[in-house]
A protein has these predicted regions:
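C-terminal membrane-cytosol helix-exit motif in multi-pass small-molecule transporters
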Residues: 171-190, 382-386
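Conserved MFS/SLC helix-loop-helix module at the cytosolic interface between two early adjacent transmembrane helices
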Residues: 60-98
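Helix-loop-helix hairpin linking two adjacent transmembrane segments in secondary transporters
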Residues: 137-182
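Juxtamembrane intracellular "pre-TM" segments in multi-pass secondary transporters
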Residues: 2-5, 185-217
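Intracellular juxtamembrane helix-capping segments at the cytosolic ends
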Residues: 114-126, 317-330
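Cytoplasmic helix-loop-helix junction between adjacent transmembrane helices
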Residues: 105-142
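Helix-to-loop junctions at the C-terminal end of transmembrane segments
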Residues: 62-73, 262-276, 360
Length: 397
């Protein structure tokens, strides 16, 4: 397959849009948590379980489904996942209780692992020199989907009720299932002759024997925990004094973070120029800075806007660096490498969402921001600890 033929900007833009629309299902409920609290007469700590269930469902979907990308044609697998997600979204629109909505959110997000099926597939088609650029395109779509989903969900909830968000999302997934064959060229999967059980168990072997995979997992989980802690409680922060926003305004706040995604293609070029270690260091430093600023000036709206932007770009930098690193390890195992990385990533996200909600109830914004800062500091310590004895090894990836 020629990369000049199949990785035109138009093709990559279409795939990035598909990935963004898919991953939006994991995150749009974060803008609705205060709405759920009012509609179901529950507190902020309880609503955080909806976000946590979503991320855990996504992680389990990645763990159980994405490894099939080493065996099954991506087009067929993605169409099945899109149909499943659409059906579960319609079911969620009928929810009246927290437990039911959290359970169905878990099932929705199990099927929303489509971007993680496509990422290793497309990375395998890319040349080594353009791999970072391809990953950066897809990461741009993912983060735009994450951030715009909150804005759109907030607007729909204010004007049509929260049930309408799920109806619209179901229709979008059904449309994506129809459009997908026109965007994604159908190619045969590698067809590794390994039983499904052995395919799953082989991921433990990869994790144990690939130090760069373990490093990427640790960095990704820590930064994503910080990112999730911020976004799981920011709606409560903005809806309370002194900001007193409504759901639409909270959703629009997320649009500021979307500006950072305009820089994501540059992240791919920076990664190719300076290496993954330097980009990982920059990612963690920006994450630390965003939480320090938000703790110092939590009641200044402009500071929170700036922090959202910094944090989004930090996440983008880290993801591009980490996935460039792991996709260089073993060409025949890219889906499983990505599975291990993303499961760790979203377990970190679930941890950040759950603990962020708890700390918000106990200590307010200071507790949540402290959690984010600690996660970033731990990531920095881990990277520096491994970098010292292995600087020559790490500098080449």
């Amino acid at each position: 397959m020629s990369s000049n033929t199949h990785f035109t900007p138009l093709i990559l833009a279409g795939i990035a849009a598909l990935c963004g629309l898919s991953v939006a299902n994991v995150y749009f409920n974060q803008a609705l948590l205060p709405v759920f609290a009012g509609a179901m007469s529950i507190d902020a700590g309880q609503t955080s379980w909806i976000a946590t269930a979503s991320q855990m469902g996504y992680a389990l979907g990645i763990l159980l489904i994405v490894p099939l990308g080493d065996r099954v044609a991506p087009l067929r697998l993605c169409r099945v996942l899109l149909a499943w997600t659409a059906a579960m979204l319609l079911l969620a629109s009928q929810a009246t209780q927290l437990s039911f909505l959290a359970g169905v959110s878990f099932l929705i997000c199990m099927g929303t692992c489509i971007p993680q099926v496509l990422l290793p597939y497309l990375a395998g088609l890319a040349t080594a020199g353009e791999r970072s650029r391809v990953i950066a395109w897809i990461q741009t779509g993912l983060v735009i989907g994450i951030l715009l989903s909150r804005a759109i969900a907030g607007w729909l909830a204010d004007h049509l009720g929260w049930h309408s968000v799920y109806w619209v999302a179901a229709c979008v997934m059904a449309l994506c299932a129809l459009v997908l064959p026109r965007i994604l060229p159908q190619r045969h999967a590698p067809g590794i002759p390994v039983a499904y059980g052995r395919l799953l168990s082989s991921m433990l072997h990869l994790f144990w024997h690939e130090p760069l995979l373990r490093l990427s997992c640790a960095l990704g989980a820590a930064v994503f925990a910080a990112f999730s802690a911020f976004w799981s409680v920011i709606a409560f922060k903005l809806m309370g004094p002194p900001h007193n926003m409504n759901a639409t305004e909270v959703g629009l706040f997320s649009l500021w973070g979307a500006l950072a995604t305009l820089l994501t293609p540059a992240a791919g070029k920076l990664c190719e120029r300076f290496g993954t270690v330097a980009i990982s260091l920059a990612s963690i430093a920006l994450c630390c800075l965003s939480f320090v600023l938000s703790m110092a000036w939590a009641n200044l709206f402009i500071v929170l806007l700036a922090c959202a932007n910094l944090l989004s770009f930090a996440l983008q930098l880290g993801q591009v660096a980490n996935q460039t690193r792991i996709f260089s390890l073993s060409p025949e195992s890219r889906s499983r490498l990505n599975t291990v990385y993303m499961v760790c990533n979203f377990c970190g996200g679930a941890f950040g969402s759950a603990l962020g909600g708890y700390l918000w109830l106990r200590f307010g914004w200071t507790g949540c921001a402290t959690l984010g800062l600690l996660c970033a500091v731990l990531a920095m310590v881990a990277l520096l600890a491994i970098l010292r004895p292995r600087s020559k090894q790490l500098s080449v990836v």
